[in-house]
């Protein structure tokens, strides 16, 4: 330690001497920078000296103390952290945003051109459209010309001379002197409260390099490698090294907001971060105090909040905008993407574990968001990387993609950076179908035979095919997913649950084996209803389990994860839906993952696997994917393997990413091909491919057994065959790949023959429904023979009647003019009304004779119609401006509800409930028109009754409040002395004591009867009161039971004061003042209670509180609410 201190001492004085020499020729600005650096070096020197003194004296610093000591040198030179200073740096001074940065843009372009000449294409394309970037290109050309003047043979490849190398070294030395020292972390930064792994340090250095070169980037490490920690460490670099404490905006999914805040507080506790969330009022308070008050370093918000609160967020000049799960902005037309493009920021960073999931255009959308000045034209980007036919061209394009993406994207996978994490073993388990599954599979195909055969001339709708696909996938999972498939009632949990689904048979064998081996299992499925079946199965087999799906509450979700990850947990199985449980969860206590079915998007399955296969996993993870052989699932798996092969070819080679510009996997042709796959086997075979025997419910028998070892061996060979098939495909094959290519060999197309073999068994025994549908051949020939005709109807349709909503209070005369105009339009176009027009105009009419009369009336109206006169046109325009067409039904219903809640005359309270959709003036105008024309509103009696009933409740509550006030004012100490003249009957076996009744009345008076949560507050007061500490009955009452007793007591008071209470204007004014006074007393009481809790023990505080409430508080409370000029009874 002494040696290290001596070395530090030597370097400190060496640095100090160099700074003094340098200052002789430096400007004031550069001197300030070096002065800060000098302070940092001095602080480090003093810190090392303090550590040496501690060790010499024998004292030991705690980890927290050591971190705080390590942090002190980094805090030197930070800007003052107070809201007023922050406002000068955080708030935008120019409403139009920042000006064009010629120097920064030139530096960025120069750096990219130094990496590859390919960027010149995009820069020139941008310069041709924008004169600002033409200026940048001119500066670059000028710099290039100046550089060429220094050497005569730069374009000739040869060895450098000593003179040239010396010149380059001198140039690098000058650049080091001109700028502050560039930090390259070789170990975990001291400002991070923990240790970073070596690859994470490399990631931080990469982010630092991007920042230095003014380039935004995509951190696309595989999930589980600590992207959040790397990002927080980089923000720490900006804060402590660059002295840029903010403002930073982190945008993340709602489920990970708290995790971001926890990680920031854990790794860099000095950073002031907060989450912008809550209801409208809570968000408004946060925005006013924290955001616009500039009392923050980092703001964390969800995608939805960004859209809702875009207006205040646009006022901040963000240093960095960081987007977690950045594939949310892959569509540049989405609302989130458009809103974010309106924000002003100096830099941007995208974080994602799945950089691209679909095509080239989505890659361009991400790059356009990061660097809009370079990647400005989507068409140009697509054309530049369009694939050619030859293999050489494919290799060239792959190399170009790597070169272009390399500066912006960092992607590492676990097997590369985490040597302690063993690679996961994946195996596709190919299972057959049970006899019940065969039956249902065949039934689904027969139900829509024309669509399955593809025999119609017109193409089937994509929705229809997707529906068939979904039903077939359900059948492959378990036939009990169909209503009516499970035998019963009575419904039993028996062996039939397992043996009616081949997948569950295999899973049953597999889980038994894994249980014996001591493994723990995660089971993922797309369908939450399948998890219901698996829950019954786990109960049947006595397997302890946890479950998470899309409907699981956040608290239950965390509890389930904690229970499963707890030491010595007995939970064997964790059931999860792929989308809800595949993101943001750490389940490394499991070592086996079972994918019960496959997702359309293979990245979702990879995310599911990574719940267990991530850093911290000590065992080798095994992944079993259940696939129904010769079914749609097999084709879905092939499609997923194709996508992942593309990822391996283009993304992993240089850790950059690209997805092909592919035909959609769910296109009609591809869907039809998937549906037809294996259909012939289903119709040819009447027996099961999985288990021929299906036991009856309740029999306790088992179906035919499965040899698991043999199945594993066969599945392993088939999995290898599938992977080998796609390993040989090149980039062009993958970009143009579709299912038809599998039928082409040696120049011949075998597709038609194979489709005949598939389809013909389906037509052998068509059902009656299919026989009727064969008449659709007429539709086919009609379409074929009329291909040249226009699909437009030969005559126009009659305009539909104008829809009038009675609550919008439009003038009734306007409807007459609209109808007259509609009839004239029909006459002018020569339209003859039909029965459809009768239904549209008069609704459903059951009487045929009446229908004919209405039709004749409609025809007569059309024949006798006349165009609107000029006066009628003017009246129509005037009447259209009247009414309240901007009030929709939802707002009208809310108006009715809050009018009853607050009373029809409480316009301000009603307007508060309807804000921000309606202003106070709009509500006042509508209320006036509503009560003046209420008879014009349909079912107005119903709405009037709702409001009047609610107003009666308000009036009754006020009467009860007044009766309660008068009763309490009769006694000096009502908690002990109050007596009811008409006490409630005590017929019940267990009733309330007089002391309990008095306490309920006192608490009702304290909080007010008009509060919705008054009985929840009364319950809390009872449980906090030491007088009832041993009264289990009273303490265990629910708010509903207390409300029942409270209403009974209030009715007794109403009897007592029934004749003496009149709610005149004077009484109402006094009660309003009392409410305000009571609110003030409650606030003071709450503040007093809070202070007491800080200074005394909890029990003494409660005693003081009840004594104050019972002896003094009530008397004072009643006295303050009684006017001085009113005498008590």
UniProtKB/Swiss-Prot annotation:
The keyword Transmembrane does not apply. Residues 506-657 form the Helicase C-terminal domain. This is ISWI chromatin-remodeling complex ATPase ISW1. Residues 144-177, 683-705, 1073-1129 are annotated as: Disordered. One of its GO terms (cellular component) is nucleolar chromatin. Belongs to the SNF2/RAD54 helicase family. ISWI subfamily. Catalytic component of ISW1-type complexes, which act by remodeling the chromatin by catalyzing an ATP-dependent alteration in the structure of nucleosomal DNA. They are involved in coordinating transcriptional repression, activation and elongation phases. The ISW1A complex represses gene expression at initiation through specific positioning of a promoter proximal dinucleosome. The ISW1B complex acts within coding regions to control the amount of RNA polymerase II released into productive elongation and to coordinate elongation with termination and pre-mRNA processing. It holds the Pfam family HAND. Component of the ISW1A complex, which at least consists of ISW1 and IOC3. Component of the ISW1B complex, which at least consists of ISW1, IOC2 and IOC4. Changing residue 227 to A: Abolishes ATPase activity. Present with 1500 molecules/cell in log phase SD medium. Residues 164-177 have a biased composition (Acidic residues). CDD domains: DEXHc_SMARCA1_SMARCA5, SANT, SF2_C_SNF. A motif (DEAH box) lies at residues 324-327. One of its GO terms (molecular function) is chromatin binding. It comes from Saccharomyces cerevisiae (strain ATCC 204508 / S288c) (Baker's yeast). Keywords: ATP-binding, Chromatin regulator, DNA-binding, Helicase, Hydrolase, Nucleotide-binding, Nucleus, Phosphoprotein, Repeat, Repressor, Transcription, Transcription regulation. Residues 147-160 have a biased composition (Basic residues). GO terms for biological process: chromatin remodeling; DNA-templated transcription elongation; negative regulation of IRE1-mediated unfolded protein response; negative regulation of RNA export from nucleus; positive regulation of transcription by RNA polymerase II; regulation of chromatin organization; regulation of DNA-templated transcription; regulation of transcriptional start site selection at RNA polymerase II promoter. Residues 882-935, 988-1052 form the SANT domain. Residues 1073-1108 have a biased composition (Basic and acidic residues). The lineage of its organism: Eukaryota, Fungi, Dikarya, Ascomycota, Saccharomycotina. Residues 208-373 form the Helicase ATP-binding domain. Its EC number is 3.6.4.-. It is found in: Nucleus. PANTHER family: CHROMODOMAIN-HELICASE-DNA-BINDING PROTEIN 3-RELATED-RELATED, SWI_SNF-RELATED MATRIX-ASSOCIATED ACTIN-DEPENDENT REGULATOR OF CHROMATIN SUBFAMILY A MEMBER 5. The modification Phosphoserine is found at residue 846.
């Amino acid at each position: 330690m002494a040696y290290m201190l001596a070395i530090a001492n030597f370097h400190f004085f060496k640095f100090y001497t160099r700074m003094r020499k340098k200052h002789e020729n430096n400007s004031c600005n550069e001197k300030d920078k070096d002065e800060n650096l000098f302070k940092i070096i001095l602080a480090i020197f003093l810190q090392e000296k303090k550590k040496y003194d501690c060790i010499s004296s024998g004292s030991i610093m705690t980890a927290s103390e050591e971190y705080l000591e390590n942090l002190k040198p980094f805090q030197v030179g930070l800007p003052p952290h107070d809201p007023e200073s922050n406002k000068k740096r955080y708030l935008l001074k120019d409403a139009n945003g920042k000006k064009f940065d010629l120097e920064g843009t030139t530096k960025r372009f120069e750096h990219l051109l130094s990496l590859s000449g390919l960027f010149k294409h995009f820069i020139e394309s941008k310069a041709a459209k924008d004169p600002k970037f033409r200026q940048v290109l001119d500066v670059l050309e000028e710099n290039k010309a100046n550089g060429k003047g220094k050497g005569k043979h730069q374009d000739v490849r040869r060895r450098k001379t000593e003179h040239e190398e010396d010149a380059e070294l001198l140039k690098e030395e000058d650049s080091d002197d001109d700028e502050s020292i560039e930090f390259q972390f070789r170990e975990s930064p001291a400002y991070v409260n923990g240790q970073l792994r070596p690859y994470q340090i490399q990631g931080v250095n990469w982010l630092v390099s991007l920042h230095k070169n003014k380039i935004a980037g995509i951190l696309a490490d595989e999930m589980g490698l600590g992207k959040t920690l790397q990002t927080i460490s980089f923000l720490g670099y900006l804060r402590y090294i660059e002295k840029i404490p903010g403002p930073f905006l982190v945008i993340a999914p709602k489920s990970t907001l708290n995790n971001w805040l926890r990680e920031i507080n854990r790794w860099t506790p000095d950073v002031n971060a907060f989450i912008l969330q809550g209801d409208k009022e809570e968000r408004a308070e946060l925005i006013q105090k924290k955001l616009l008050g500039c009392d923050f370093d980092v703001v964390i918000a969800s995608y939805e909040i960004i859209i809702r609160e875009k207006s205040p967020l646009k006022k901040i000049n963000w240093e960095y905008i960081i987007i977690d799960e950045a594939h949310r902005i892959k569509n540049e037309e989405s609302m989130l993407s458009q809103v974010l493009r309106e924000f002003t920021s100096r830099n941007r960073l995208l974080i994602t574990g799945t950089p691209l999931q679909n095509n080239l255009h989505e890659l361009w959308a991400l790059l356009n968001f990061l660097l809009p000045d370079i990647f400005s034209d989507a068409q140009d980007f697509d054309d530049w990387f369009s694939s050619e036919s030859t293999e050489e061209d494919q290799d060239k394009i792959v190399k170009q993609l790597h070169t272009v993406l390399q500066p912006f994207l960092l992607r590492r996978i676990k097997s590369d950076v985490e040597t302690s994490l063993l690679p996961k073993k994946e195996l596709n388990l190919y299972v057959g179908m049970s006899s019940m599954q065969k039956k249902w599979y065949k039934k689904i195909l027969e139900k829509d035979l024309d669509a399955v055969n593809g025999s119609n001339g017109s193409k089937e709708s994509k929705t229809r095919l997707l529906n068939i696909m979904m039903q077939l996938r359900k059948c492959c999972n378990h036939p009990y997913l169909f209503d009516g498939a499970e035998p019963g009632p009575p419904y039993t949990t028996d062996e039939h649950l397992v043996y009616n689904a081949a997948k569950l048979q295999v899973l049953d064998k597999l889980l038994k084996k894994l249980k014996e081996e001591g493994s723990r299992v995660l089971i993922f499925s797309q369908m939450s209803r399948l998890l219901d079946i698996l829950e019954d199965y786990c109960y049947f087999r006595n397997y302890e389990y946890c479950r998470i799906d899309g409907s699981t509450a956040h608290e239950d979700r965390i509890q389930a994860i904690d229970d499963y990850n707890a030491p010595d947990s007995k939970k064997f199985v964790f059931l999860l839906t792929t989308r809800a449980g595949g993101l943001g969860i750490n389940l490394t206590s499991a070592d086996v993952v079972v994918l019960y079915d496959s997702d359309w998007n293979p990245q979702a399955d990879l995310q599911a696997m990574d719940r267990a296969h991530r850093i911290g996993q000590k065992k080798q993870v095994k992944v079993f994917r259940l696939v129904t052989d010769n079914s749609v699932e097999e084709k879905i798996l092939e499609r997923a393997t194709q996508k992942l092969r593309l990822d391996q070819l283009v993304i992993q080679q240089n850790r950059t990413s690209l997805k092909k510009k592919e035909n959609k996997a769910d296109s009609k042709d591809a869907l039809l091909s998937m549906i037809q796959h294996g259909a012939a086997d289903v119709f040819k075979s009447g027996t099961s491919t999985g288990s021929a025997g299906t036991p009856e419910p309740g029999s306790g028998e088992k179906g035919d057994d499965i040899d698991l070892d043999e199945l594993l061996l066969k599945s392993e060979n088939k999995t290898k065959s599938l992977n080998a098939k796609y390993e040989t495909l090149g980039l062009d094959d993958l970009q143009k790949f579709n299912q038809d290519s599998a039928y082409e060999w040696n120049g011949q197309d075998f597709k038609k023959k194979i489709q005949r073999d598939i389809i013909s068994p389906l037509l052998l025994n068509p059902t009656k429904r299919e026989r009727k549908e064969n008449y659709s051949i007429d539709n086919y020939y009609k379409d074929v023979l009329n291909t040249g005709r226009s699909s437009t109807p030969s005559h126009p349709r009659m305009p539909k009647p104008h829809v009038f909503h009675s609550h919008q209070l439009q003038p009734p005369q306007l409807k007459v003019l609209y109808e007259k105009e509609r009839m004239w339009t029909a006459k002018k176009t020569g339209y003859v009304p039909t029965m459809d027009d009768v239904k549209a105009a008069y609704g459903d009419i059951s009487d045929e004779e009446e229908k004919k009369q209405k039709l004749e009336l409609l025809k007569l109206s059309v024949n006798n119609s006349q165009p609107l006169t000029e006066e009628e046109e003017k009246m129509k325009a005037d009447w259209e401006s009247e009414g309240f067409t901007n009030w929709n039904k939802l707002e009208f219903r809310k108006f009715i509800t809050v009018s009853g809640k607050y009373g029809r005359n409480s316009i301000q309270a009603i307007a508060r409930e309807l804000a921000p959709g309606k202003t106070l003036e709009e509500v006042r105008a509508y209320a006036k028109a509503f009560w003046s024309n209420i008879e014009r509103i349909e079912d107005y009696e119903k709405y009037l009754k709702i409001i009047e009933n609610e107003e009666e409740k308000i009036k009754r509550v006020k009467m009860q409040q007044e009766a309660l006030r008068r009763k309490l004012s009769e006694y000096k100490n009502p908690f002990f002395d109050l007596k009811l003249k008409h006490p409630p009957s005590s017929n019940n076996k267990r009733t309330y004591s007089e002391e309990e009744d008095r306490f309920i009345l006192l608490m009702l008076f304290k909080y007010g009867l008009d509060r919705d949560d008054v009985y929840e507050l009364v319950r809390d007061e009872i449980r906090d009161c030491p007088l009832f500490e041993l009264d289990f009955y009273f303490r265990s009452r629910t708010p509903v039971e207390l409300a029942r007793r409270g209403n009974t007591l209030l009715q007794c008071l109403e009897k007592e004061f029934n004749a003496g209470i009149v709610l005149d204007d004077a009484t109402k004014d006094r009660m309003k003042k009392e409410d305000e006074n009571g609110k003030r007393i409650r606030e003071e009481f709450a503040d007093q209670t809070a202070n007491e809790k800080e200074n005394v023990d909890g029990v003494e505080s409660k005693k003081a509180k009840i004594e104050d409430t019972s002896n003094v508080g009530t008397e004072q409370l009643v006295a303050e609410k009684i006017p001085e000029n009113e005498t008590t009874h």
